[in-house]
Every structure is written in C-alpha cells, then in structure tokens.
C-alpha cells in the first residue's frame, strides 16, 4: 500500500475510533429505559479488536479503488459475448439473401440457423472439462480462434455444404465462450463489482445482436455477395479478443487450484490495486483445500454435484434459469424477428430487416439498464420483475396476432389447378389458413386499402419467392402486373402490433432474464464444481435454444401464430413461480459464502431476501453472542 493510502487508512481509523468513543459517551444511564441494552452495546463496541476496526476501515476506504486493469480484462472477455450475439443474430438477415442466391429449401435454412446452435450446445457441455484442464484464459483463446476460422470459411463459402461447415465451427467457438467468459469475469472481479461486470458480458451479447442487425440492413442492398460480408465480419472481434488475451492473465482461483500460488498472488494483487489481498487469498485457498478434501471420493464431478445437496440445489436453480430463459422465447424473438415481422404483414424484406434492428437496439439499451440495476436491486428482484413483464408482453404479442387473424383476407379467386398439382392450397378460404401451411402462398392485388383477386396456391419448391404455377409463378412478371406474393404472412393493417409487442417484450426481458441466468450461474457453485456447473447450465441453455428455434415454425403451423406466443407466455408464467420459490439473493456476497444459501431445501431458499447491508451482525461480549442493531452495525462499518 502506498504512503498516501496508509495515511488515509490511519485517518479513517482515528475517525472511526472517535465516532465509537462519542457513541459510548452518548449512552443513557443503566437505569434509564433501554439502558441495559445501551450499556451492553457500549461494552460490545469497546470489545472490538483493532483488527476488526482496521478491516472495517479498509472496506470503507478501498470500496471504489478498483484498477482499470480489471475493467480491461472484463471488456476483452466480453468480446466473446459480442461474438455470441453477432453470430447468432446475423444469420436472420443473411438468410434472406442466401435462400435466393443458393435456392435454399426450408430444411437447409433450418440447418444453417440451428447448426451453429447445436454445435454450441455440444461445446458448452464439454467446456467445463476443457476450461478446468486448460484454464479459463486458454479456453477463451481457443474459442476466439475457432470463431475466426469459422467466419473465414463462411465468407469464402461456394456452396451450402461449406456454409454448414463454417456454421458448425463458429458454433463450437461461441459454445466454449458462452460458459467460460462469465466464469473468468466472476473470478477476476471484486465482490462489489462482480454482478455488474458479469452483466457486461450480456451487454456485449445484445450489442453484438444489434450490430449484426445493422450490418444485415447495410449489406441487404448487395443482393449477390452481401451475405459474405455479413457472415465474415465476425472474424474482426474474434481476432481482437485473441490478441488481447495474449496479454491478459489466467484466473487467480484456477492458478491456486493448480498449485501456482505465487503467480496467483501476483495477479490477484495486480487486480486489486491498493487493496490488501491476504484475506481474499486465504479465503480462496481455504475453500480450495476444503473442496479438495471433499473431492477425494472417486467419481465424475457431476456425480459428486448431484450427490451433495447444496450443489445439487444450485445446479437445479442454475439450469432452471437457463431453461426458462429459452422457453420464454428470447431466441425465437432474436433469430426470427424479421420473420415474425413478415408474419405480421410486413411485405418488403429490407423493411423487415431494418425494423428488426429496432428490436435489437431495444435489447441493447435495456441491457444497459440491467447493468445499472443489478447491484442496486439485486439478482432475485430483478429476475422476478423481468419475467413478470415478459409474460405480459408475450400475451400482448399473441393478442396482436389474434387480432390480425380475425381480419384475415378471404380467398376470392380460385384459379384452375393443373392436373398434376396438389389441390390442398386452393381449398383454403382465408389467408391465415393458407399461411399456416408451409407448402402454400398467397397471391393477391391491392385496390386502395382493399385486398382483391386473392388466391392460395402452392409455393415453388425451389424458391419461396414465387408460386409453383399461376399468376405469381414468375417474380418479374407478377410485379409488372401489379400482383403481390406473400409467403408466411398475410396483408393486414395491424402489422404494427407485432413491432410494439416485440419492443415491449425486450424492454422487460433485457434487464433481467437476459443477463441474470449467466450472472447467477457464475456465482452459485463452489470452485470445484464451478466449471462443470457452468458447463451444464450453458449446455441446457443451448439445448433448449435448439429445441425452441427448431420448433417455432412448426409450432406456429400447428397452434397458429398467436397460439405459439400464448404457449411461450405459459412457460414464462411457470418460470415466474420457479424464480419466486427457488432463487436466493446473491448480491454482495463472496463466492465462498454463497454455497451456504443452498443448505436448506430448494423451495425455501428464495423465501426472503438476504440482509446484505450489514457486514457485522454478531460480536462476542463476555463469552456470549450479541446481535448488533442496524445502527450499531452502521457505526462499526
């Protein structure tokens, strides 16, 4: 500690001692009402040891003294979140160009969208063993290298098979990053900033999604090679992260676990600036020693986690949060935002892409709100409020699609079906019925605001941009004749309701349910189980991500568009009950203290918020424990 810092601490100690002495002089006489307790409080304060006073003073003095190095480490780490957001968001706009140029059918579109997600799920499940063996830093370097290679393959792809290979490589990279980055940030951050810095990762995810939507819009005017720029630009942040991590240190906790104690002390001291690290270092080392004693039993870590009640409960909470994040429909919204807007009646592809960027921007801005709220409101309240608002927004979105369905245009023109064609499409009477069949499209003309000469006909199997036969079987011809072709949407005056619903959804989702599952999972596991716990929860996130993204179009087909969003609202409501009953508050607690929150049965751990405002709750007075009042605690602190 510097000379100036030492003088400041000594001054703070003198001030605190004076304050304690003044408090003792102000105590009532023993015979006065409350005198017995006041005397005991005075004796309690007098019995505090100098070391306790010094720790209290250092906490007060050092609270805001965090080196810029910690923020730099968090920022370079969070570039993994940016890649996560960019690579999962950019495919939405790129697909509109790819399906035209490479004439992709529905199956190949689904493969390219979900291929990266599936690979990420596999990588996330294996990532626990990977970053436990190689270290957090090496795992992040590997992730950024994979993203760089995958992006280059995508930019140079000449066919759909190469595109799929590139998406798989990118998926492996973002899967490793998805569960390693939050752990690294949590382990290098001081307790008072941990939640905020981990939330920065989610801020970068949403920033990546917003940037991807802007890139999609900008390059949507390049019909031939625009998708190459969209998919290839992800290599730039991947290279920056790789170069940055060549100069960043390994996690001190991982180094201590591997026996590299001197290096760990040096790095921990560098990351804590003017703060003394002895207490934190001893706490980490002691927890590791205890965990290593418990780990002497044979068997995989996941088996030990499941057999040990506190970690089993933590795993249920962590995986449950990730599951409900996906079941509430977030990646349906993000992957299919342009498609959802088209479903609501937006005809032009470019307009749908630019409108989708509004939703991505909303997600980004309100994630910033979450960064500000996480250490003020706490994890539990923020998650609960976010999920409650998300449920309401999904209901509003569903009602908007229901309203559009109620005014769906009728089929007024039934062309003669060629003898070799299926007649299923021509049998539908309304546009919304036609749209729910993936083999059909809606051909129509517009007179003022009225839809006229409308028919439901089979879609061209080689391209969804035109019909298999009839007036709309040639895009150039039907546009010249004033006709319109709609696939997966119906013309409606209520298309604005979908945009409002999407924006409202992200206003509520982004501050809480977006970052909190990752933040909570980075905190709730003991060190010996942290990598495996985060790998399992990230894997659950990706698995349900795949399930929801692969089934959305089929769900909309069988349940209707509004039925699909009512279903997601139901899942979100169940998640609300889960958060209320099972999620404890971890705000302001050391990572080594959080395990005790799961000592009790699962659905009582979130029954009440913790009193995190007091550092000293009990002191020893003449051989017995005395509970300090709030005022006592504030005086000591």
UniProtKB/Swiss-Prot annotation:
Ranges of the Cytoplasmic topological domain: 1-65, 136-137, 189-201, 250-313, 374-382, 519-538, 584-637
Extracellular compartment spans: 87-114, 159-167, 223-228, 335-352, 404-497, 560-562
Signal peptide coordinates: none
Annotated membrane topology: Multi-pass membrane protein
Main location: membrane
Residue intervals passing through the bilayer: 66-86, 115-135, 138-158, 168-188, 202-222, 229-249, 314-334, 353-373, 383-403, 498-518, 539-559, 563-583
GO process annotations (BP): positive regulation of amyloid-beta formation
Pfam assignment, any one: Sugar_tr
GO cellular component entries: astrocyte end-foot; cell body; cytoplasm; growth cone; intracellular membrane-bounded organelle; organelle membrane; plasma membrane
Region (Disordered): 15-38
Classification via PROSITE patterns: MFS, SUGAR_TRANSPORT_1, SUGAR_TRANSPORT_2
Glycosylation site residues: 422, 447, 474
Location(s) in or outside the cell: Cell membrane
Any one Gene Ontology molecular-function term assigned to this protein's record: ATPase binding
SUPFAM superfamilies: MFS general substrate transporter
Positions carrying Phosphoserine: 6, 44, 47, 629, 634
Keywords assigned by UniProt, alphabetized: Cell membrane, Glycoprotein, Membrane, Phosphoprotein, Transmembrane, Transmembrane helix, Transport
Reactions the enzyme catalyzes: myo-inositol(out) + H(+)(out) = myo-inositol(in) + H(+)(in)
Function of the protein: H(+)-myo-inositol cotransporter. Can also transport related stereoisomers.
Family that this chain belongs to: Belongs to the major facilitator superfamily. Sugar transporter (TC 2.A.1.1) family.
Identification of the protein by name: Proton myo-inositol cotransporter
Source organism (scientific name): Mus musculus (Mouse)
Lineage, broadest ranks: Eukaryota, Metazoa, Chordata, Craniata, Vertebrata
Gene name of this polypeptide: Slc2a13
